[in-house]
């Protein structure tokens, strides 16, 4: 099954509260002609109108905000990191969710941000530096190989974010079309990564799995796979009514979430190691 949404793209910004108060930034941008609308998050706004690219302002360069979809802000919120947590971000670039986690942790605790691509690792480093993040270790490695080092040294995590590579990333590339083979490849890789993630969790640790794909094979089927394969993991119920103003509904597995257009499509599930 291939689902492609090509409607009008909504634009949002996440205010970096490590550097600036949301209302202060809102006034600065509105004074420049940007029209902002509040969301369910007091530090996120929808950009209704802007006389210039929202990614080319002094405020952006100062690290006062991150342009990203409201959908992509949900996984870090669902993971709900504490200030003293030891966290793994398995597929971290370009850093929107990594820097969001750091913001929620108030730059405390420790985040290990892993990215397989050298090029994307540069973007990750750039965003972490721009946003003033101080609690993050960046690792340029293949998670499928890096896990051997972690397991050998008995390094386990309180919480893990797996925002998995998916066919939704291919859709964003205007020069490519998604094929059934792309979906199958992504699904196999996602199953491998989520299995690794559970291996690296401490007992009672939690993992949030997310994609920007609409395909069942990359979402519910991945969760079904890991729940059937392992007896040391359980699904944690997420409630859709916590995210007001978004077209969000329960997924095809009870307790999972799906975000639908006009918001950026997303799937979110939460697991606990038992």
From Swiss-Prot:
This is tRNA (cytosine(48)-C(5))-methyltransferase. The keyword tRNA processing applies. GO terms for molecular function: RNA binding; tRNA (cytidine-5-)-methyltransferase activity. It comes from the Archaea. InterPro entries: MeTrfase_RsmB-F_NOP2_cat, MeTrfase_RsmB-F_NOP2_dom, Nop2p, RCMT, RsmB/NOL1/NOP2-like_CS, SAM-dependent_MTases_sf. GO terms for cellular component: cytoplasm. It is found in: Cytoplasm. The active site is at 212 (nucleophile). Its EC number is 2.1.1.-. It catalyses: cytidine(48) in tRNA precursor + S-adenosyl-L-methionine = 5-methylcytidine(48) in tRNA precursor + S-adenosyl-L-homocysteine + H(+); cytidine(40) in tRNA precursor + S-adenosyl-L-methionine = 5-methylcytidine(40) in tRNA precursor + S-adenosyl-L-homocysteine + H(+). The lineage of its organism: Archaea, Methanobacteriati, Methanobacteriota, Methanomada group, Methanococci. Keywords: Cytoplasm, Methyltransferase, RNA-binding, S-adenosyl-L-methionine, Transferase, tRNA processing. It holds the Pfam family Methyltr_RsmB-F.
